[in-house]
Swiss-Prot record:
It holds the Pfam family Ribosomal_L36. GO terms for cellular component: ribonucleoprotein complex; ribosome. It comes from Ehrlichia canis (strain Jake). PROSITE patterns: RIBOSOMAL_L36. One of its GO terms (biological process) is translation. This is Large ribosomal subunit protein bL36.
Length: 42
């Protein structure tokens, strides 16, 4: 999982990317291609 400053670029990498919010953090998840997972930095 990558930790990045802005999820906008991570969101558009693949059409199956979804943004979810868990415990106050914002994540990008992708069920079909899990290597696109990312988390907002702060």
């Amino acid at each position: 999982m990558k930790v990045i400053g802005s999820l906008k670029s991570a969101k558009v990498r693949d059409k199956d990317c979804r943004i979810v919010r868990r415990k106050g953090r914002i994540y990008v998840i992708n069920k079909k291609n899990p290597r696109f997972k990312a988390r907002q930095g702060y």
